[in-house]
Structures are given as C-alpha cells and as structure tokens.
Regions:
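N-terminal Sec-pathway targeting helices
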Residues: 8-26
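Low-complexity, Ser/Thr/Pro/Gly-enriched N-terminal "stalk/linker" regions
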Residues: 40-90, 97-137, 171, 177-188, ...
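Well-ordered alpha-helical scaffold segments within catalytic/enzyme domains
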Residues: 46, 89-106, 154-172, 212-227, ...
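Extended ligand-binding clefts on enzyme/binding-domain cores
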Residues: 54-60, 70-86, 146-150, 174, ...
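Solenoid-repeat scaffolds in large eukaryotic assemblies
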Residues: 105-108, 112, 173, 231, ...
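Acidic/His metal-coordination segments adjacent to aromatic residues that form catalytic metal sites
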Residues: 131-143, 192-203, 343-345
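Alpha-helical repeat scaffolds
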Residues: 232, 289-302, 331-341, 373-379
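Fungal-biased detection of long, low-complexity, Ser/Thr-
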Residues: 309-314, 318-377
C-alpha cells in the first residue's frame, strides 16, 4: 500500500514536470512567433512610412512650384489662374505637415510665412472681406466675392495658429497682429447666438463654416497668443452651440443648415460630407459612437477612398482626414495610393494645390497611426 502511494507521487511529479516543460515550450514558441511577427510588422511599416515621406516631399514640392512672387499660392499649375485664399490656406497647411524623418524645411517655413504676409495684407486691405483673385497681365485682379466670409476667416486663423505653433514664433510682425485682431472682430460680428452666419448680408448658418471657424480659434488658442483668454471664450461659445444647433437627434445626423432638416441621402456634397466634417476638423463630439456610425455609413455609401468620382469639380481628398481620426489605416492608404497613381505625374484637372495640401496632412497623420501601431504592439 505504501509503495503504491509512492508510485502515485512519483507519477504526479513527473506529470507536473512534463506540464511545466510544455508550458515553457509554448511560451518560448509564442515569444519567438511574436518577435518574428513584430520584425515583419516593423519592416512593413518602415516601407510604408518611407513611401509616405516620398509622397509628402513631392506634394510639397508641387505646392511650392505654384507660389507666386508676392507669396500667393495658385490653385493649379504654371503660377497662373486663380488664387482662392481658402484653398491657398489648405495648401500652406500642407507645407507645415511633417514626420519624424521628414521635418519642415526652412524653405517651406519661409513659403508659409510669405503666404501669410500676402493673405494678411489682402485681409487688412479689404477690411476682412476676402475674395477670389485672378492673374491678368501680370497682376492679381479681384474676380469675385468669397462664398462664405466666416469659413474663409476660420481657415486663415487655422493656418496662422498652426504656423505659430510649428515655428514657436512669438515675435509676430505688427501687421500680422492687426490681421488676427481683425479676423477675430469679424468673426464676432458674424456671430448670432454663438454661431457664425455666412456674411453680414447672408444670415444663413452652416455646420461646415462653423466647424472651420471653431478649428481656427482652437489652433490659435493652442499657439498661445497674448489674448488667449478672449480667443478661448469665443471658441467655447461656438463649441457649445454646434451640437445644440446642428445635431438632429431624431434622425441621428448632422444638419447642414441651422434649424433645417433638409437632407438628401444620395448627395455626396453637402449632405454626405457634412456628416464627417466634425471628424475632419477634430471637433470634440460628446458621443463618439454616433460619429463612428456616420463615418461607416458615409464610407459604405460613397466609397470615397477610391477617388474615382469627381464631385462638384473637386477630388475631395479632405475625406482622408476623417479616416485618420477613425484610425482607418486601410482606406486612408487606398486613398493616397489612388491619388498617387492618378495625379502624381500629370497633375491633371481637377487637382488643385489645396487637394495636395490635404494629402500632405494625411501623410503626416497616417505616419503617426503607424507609429502608434508599433507602440501598442510593443506594450
């Protein structure tokens, strides 16, 4: 009986040893597998990031080629044709985009500074009423009125704030300070109940314009201006009102126009694009889940990443910014690949420098998403 118990004990010890060996073996194999997977992932991401830096460099180069002698940035090639300050601001924002191994150059920094000189000069000259300009006989001529004063002012402040943040510049030219002050006063004059209207003559309030104004104020606030407190108060007013005025809770979607439930599901612009505009401009929606639903619906309905439908005369590369916010790497990669395939060499219509600006920013955002992916895996 005693001998039988001893044998049982020996068998248990042997089983335990075997079990431990198996566990150690499995852990070793698992670690080896994970290490190999990480190495392959790192290699794949390195390749992707180098590609993004190549695209970023080439797009910046093209934008720079389209800057005029006074700092203005033209919409498309040959330094001729139209200068639209709204889209020029986006092109200049593209020049500020960078990655870990592809920093903003001194040339790019100076180009954005020159553009801000030009834009601010026109802003002060027109008392904040920017227009669209055309080059005729070597001179820029006022062509037509801007379609939304509030949106144009918002994009100017967006660029100004981002430039000051990136360059850490605190010693602003005096006329820049005047330009910023004028833009802020104009925005306040267009505000009704915490929301901006299109212009003094047009009292319509648009979701997209207000998000652009909010973004401009937000970036200017981040830059740490002297009157940050005043900027913050205006920004908070708009932020508080955007969801109250524009969110249609009954239909679970964004209104395009304040107090109007008109919506055409099949229309890409403005109906569809408005649903992802808060994502594009990084607006802090209170319930993030609802924005994900709208993004998924937009992607399924319009297949924006394919870039195969020219809507209202634009490529709408801006859509990739929403993908970046959602961490949608695959669709963002597809968008940039399709853009590169279709427009990289020929730069054909309807490509504008503003579209290239969004691509630059998206290259930077996608690079960051890859960095985050590696960090998460390491943890």
């Amino acid at each position: 009986m005693h001998k039988h118990k001893q044998n049982q004990c020996k068998r248990k010890v042997k089983h335990r040893k075997n079990a431990m060996k198996l566990i150690i073996f499995c852990i070793t194999v698992g670690i080896a597998f994970m290490f190999a997977y990480y190495q392959n992932l790192r290699k794949e991401i390195d390749t992707r990031q180098k590609w993004l830096e190549t695209v970023l460099t080439e797009e910046k180069k093209w934008i720079l080629e389209n800057q005029g002698p006074e700092g203005e940035i033209y919409m498309n090639g040959s330094k001729a044709g139209d200068v639209n300050p709204y889209f020029a601001c986006i092109a200049a924002l593209g020049l500020l985009a960078e990655t870990k191994n592809c920093s903003m150059t001194e040339t790019e920094k100076k180009a954005v500074g020159r553009y801000l000189d030009w834009h601010t000069g026109i802003l002060l000259e027109t008392d904040g009423k920017m227009g669209i300009y055309r080059k005729e006989n070597g001179k820029l001529i006022y062509k037509e009125k801007a379609d939304s004063e509030d949106g144009y002012l918002g994009m100017y402040l967006f660029l100004m704030g981002k430039y000051l943040e990136k360059t850490e510049n605190t010693d602003l030219p005096e006329f820049w300070k005047k330009g910023i002050s004028l833009a802020l006063k104009k925005i306040q004059s267009l505000m009704q109940d915490g929301i901006t209207q299109v212009s003094e003559e047009n009292t319509t309030v648009y979701l997209m314009d207000n998000l652009e104004v909010w973004k401009g104020l937000y970036e200017l606030e981040l830059a740490g201006m002297e009157d940050t407190q005043a900027i913050s108060e205006i920004r908070k007013k708009i932020q508080d009102q955007i969801e109250k005025i524009f969110w249609d809770d009954a239909n679970q979607r964004w209104r395009i126009i304040g107090n109007s439930d008109l919506y055409h599901q099949a229309e890409f612009y403005p109906d569809g694009i408005a649903q992802i505009y808060p994502l594009i401009y990084e607006f802090p929606v209170k319930e993030k889940k609802k924005q994900k639903v709208l993004y998924d619906q937009f992607t399924e309905r319009f297949q924006w990443q394919k870039l195969n439908k020219k809507r209202t005369g634009f490529l709408w590369t801006i859509t990739g910014m929403a993908a970046a916010q959602m961490g949608d790497i695959n669709n963002l990669v597809e968008l940039i690949e399709n853009y590169e395939t279709e427009y990289y060499k020929e730069r054909k219509y309807p490509l504008y420098t503003g579209e290239a600006g969004w691509i630059c920013m998206e290259c930077g955002k996608l690079y960051e998403l890859y960095e985050r992916k590696i960090k998460i895996f390491k943890i």
